[in-house]
């Protein structure tokens, strides 16, 4: 097993959340903001720095975040789309970083078993292979991006995420139940909280 101390993590939390009508990253779920949950998952994956890229809704997003990253990165270009946030995160990583985990804030229904399987897959291949969630047969976030991919990723623009690059590569896909259920609208958030309330009511 290779140490994961050379791997960083980026949590992308700069979006406008137009369909939600307020910053998704600041919304509360199970007593913590969605961003707090994502930062905690990032900590479980990475032995290196964890950065949160913010934009829309800042500083409220930071104020409501109980889990602090190693660095807050404000993306002044956040209105241009996700690609600028990914570029900001990659550009800020230390020069010795061999790869980064990239997480979103709107996938709280990913099942717990995914995170350990995800990390184990990255470490098994010594961080040399891109690894991503299997979203019904194609690769998507959360994802691990080896440094060799960064020059290509830095050329992305608009709302393009890493998915297009990952699909052109021999990306290892990890089953990720729940990753396809994004929280994008008030109805999604209401459903999510309803599911959680139902689970709690069944507990002894």
What kind of region is each of these model predictions?
Residues 63, 85-86, 143, 184-188:
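Short secondary-structure transition/capping segments
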Residues 1-6, 151-204:
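Conserved alpha/beta core of the MobA/IspD/sugar-nucleotide pyrophosphorylase nucleotidyltransferase superfamily
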Residues 61, 114, 149, 161-162:
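Hydrophobic alpha-helical segments typical of transmembrane helices
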Residues 28, 109, 144, 182-183:
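Short aromatic/basic micro-patch
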């Amino acid at each position: 097993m290779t140490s994961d101390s050379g791997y960083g993590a980026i949590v992308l939390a700069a979006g406008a959340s137009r369909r939600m009508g307020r910053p998704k990253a600041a919304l509360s779920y199970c007593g913590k903001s969605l961003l707090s949950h994502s930062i905690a998952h990032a900590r479980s994956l990475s032995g290196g720095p964890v950065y949160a890229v913010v934009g829309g809704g800042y500083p409220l997003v930071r104020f409501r975040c109980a889990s602090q990253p190693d660095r807050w990165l404000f993306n002044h270009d956040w209105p241009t789309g996700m690609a600028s946030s990914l570029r900001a995160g990659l550009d800020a990583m230390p020069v010795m970083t061999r790869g980064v985990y990239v997480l979103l804030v709107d996938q709280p229904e990913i099942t717990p078993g995914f995170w350990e399987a995800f990390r184990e897959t990255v470490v098994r291949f010594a961080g040399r292979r891109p690894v991503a969630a299997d979203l019904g047969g194609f690769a998507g976030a959360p994802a691990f991006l080896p440094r060799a991919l960064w020059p290509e990723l830095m050329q992305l623009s608009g709302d393009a995420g890493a998915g297009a690059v990952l699909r052109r590569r021999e990306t290892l896909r990890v089953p990720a139940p729940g990753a396809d259920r994004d929280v994008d609208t008030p109805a999604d958030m209401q459903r999510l909280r309803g599911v959680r309330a139902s689970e709690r009511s069944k507990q002894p």
